[in-house]
Amino acid sequence: MDSVKNILLEYGLRFQEPQIEKVDKYIEELLGVPYNLTAHRDLDSAVHKNVVEILLPLKEELKGTLLDVGSGNGVPGLILAIFFSKLKVVLLDSREKSVNFLRGVIEKLDLENVSVVKERAENFSKERREEFDYVTARAVARLNVLVEICTPALKTGGKLLFYKGPSYIEELKEAQRAMKELKVELEKVREYSLKTGERRALLILRKYESSPEKYPRRVGVPFKRPLL
């Protein structure tokens, strides 16, 4: 079975030994949790899905403040915090089970640049407007919903980093109204493939103006009545 280090080397990803040690501990914790928090039962699958998929499309150093919405098992936010030490990361999730897992992992990995908040994204974004340089999400919602619940917390000039699958083109078309309303524009799409055969895309959107105060709408509404 390949080690974390060997898998990252296969993709030409750069790392330092302390980072590998932390990822090893994280994967160990991840594989030990119940099925309803992660579907990965082996190291190879867990590293590809939770580490390689996150790092592979990133071409620049990330620094500043980053909010990870719907963090779940800590991806992408926790991985970005490990590999980009100049980031100050907030992991946001409304589920008690996820929050407890994340707090435990942060303590075991001795990560000083990460904190966890238990709250709905709609409430958090309204309370912490224009605070973050980056907002990330993966497997949380369709793009039009993400744009509404994430953008208000982003600084003007900041970037949304959304990890998507091959259906992102359809989601982009669907999200045009939300992007216009929330004042963000598509900066670039980085398509990439894993050696497992899976195709992925990192969508990078830039906020060019402050979002209207009426967004995000109250809890649940962006999901039930998305901007179309």
Swiss-Prot record:
CDD domains: AdoMet_MTases. One of its GO terms (molecular function) is rRNA (guanine-N7-)-methyltransferase activity. The keyword Cell division does not apply. Keywords: Cytoplasm, Methyltransferase, rRNA processing, S-adenosyl-L-methionine, Transferase. GO terms for cellular component: cytosol. Its EC number is 2.1.1.-. InterPro entries: rRNA_ssu_MeTfrase_G, SAM-dependent_MTases_sf. Its main location: cytoplasm. It is found in: Cytoplasm. It holds the Pfam family GidB. It comes from the Bacteria. S-adenosyl-L-methionine binds at G70, A121, E122, R138. Belongs to the methyltransferase superfamily. RNA methyltransferase RsmG family. HAMAP family: 16SrRNA_methyltr_G. Specifically methylates the N7 position of a guanine in 16S rRNA. This is Ribosomal RNA small subunit methyltransferase G. It comes from Thermotoga petrophila (strain ATCC BAA-488 / DSM 13995 / JCM 10881 / RKU-1).
